[in-house]
Amino acid sequence: MIKYYLYLTKPGIVLGNLMSSAGGFLIASRGAISYSLFITMIVGTALVIASGCVLNNIIDRDIDAVMERTKHRVLVQHGQIFLNQSIFYAVILSIFGFLFLSFTKNVLTIYLSAIGLFIYVGVYSLWMKRRSIYSIMVGSISGAMPPVIGYCAAANQFDAGALMLLIIFSLWQIPHSHSIAILRLNDYKVAFIPTFPIKKGVESTKNHMVVYIIGFIIATILFTVMGYTSYIFLIIISIMNLWWLHMGFYGYRIINHDSLWAKKMFLLSLIIIISLNLLLSLDHILFSTKNILL
């Protein structure tokens, strides 16, 4: 039974978002790390994200039942966990999540977490996902909140660095989500979910992906130019970004194997975001001017 409650929180999504929260926190800390604050922020953020994922599972249970990728989820399989239990579980996770965030004594992190949860559950999952091809753009804001929460927990302010993290992670979400939409095109058709590839076509979606990858590249450059990361960070992430962009352009040469290309783009987007989070976390420790001189 415990494993079903764990599955309901989408642990992979929670873990990925915690990596970005850690990256945001550590880049704002600039080496002066408060470990108690870090742990409190991580636990609180994890619980709030888990709550959002449970609520998303509750809202999407009807479409999950008809999609090949999601038909084995806990709420689709009758008898594993009941609906009222799931709702209670989500509420408890949310309460304890915000309780932990209150221990940071940083009201900003609570506000940002509440905004992210509201956008993901109320605006994206409950409303826009079934109605608009632009739902992922709104959803990308909630997906970009964890690094901003981590940053603001350490910096205790929403400054240009927090804004740049919001932009960077929002831009990454679009090509990542589009690659899933192409890869699972038939799934979304069966569930009547209006995705960009279904409504505008795969070729138009490829254009969209390339534009957002270019925007992502520019944003990561600006983040370094503004003094938040080292130039070694910029060199490493730029090499990876150009690889991603190259693969995006390669999609124009694909005619009959869009799903295979989309799978490669999806996996590459994961490599990019994991690398970005690791670089953000380690940048001040490994690549700061002080450490290089030493």
Swiss-Prot record:
Protein's membrane topology: Multi-pass membrane protein
Gene3D superfamilies found in the cross-reference section: UbiA prenyltransferase
Keywords associated with the record: Cell inner membrane, Cell membrane, Heme biosynthesis, Membrane, Transferase, Transmembrane, Transmembrane helix
Domain of life: Bacteria
EC class: transferase
Gene Ontology terms, MF aspect: protoheme IX farnesyltransferase activity
Catalytic activity: heme b + (2E,6E)-farnesyl diphosphate + H2O = Fe(II)-heme o + diphosphate
Pathway: Porphyrin-containing compound metabolism; heme O biosynthesis; heme O from protoheme: step 1/1
Residues making up the signal peptide according to the UniProt record: none
Described purpose of this protein according to its UniProt entry: Converts heme B (protoheme IX) to heme O by substitution of the vinyl group on carbon 2 of heme B porphyrin ring with a hydroxyethyl farnesyl side group.
Note: Carbon 2 of the heme B porphyrin ring is defined according to the Fischer nomenclature.
PANTHER family recorded: PROTOHEME IX FARNESYLTRANSFERASE, MITOCHONDRIAL
Name of this chain's protein: Protoheme IX farnesyltransferase
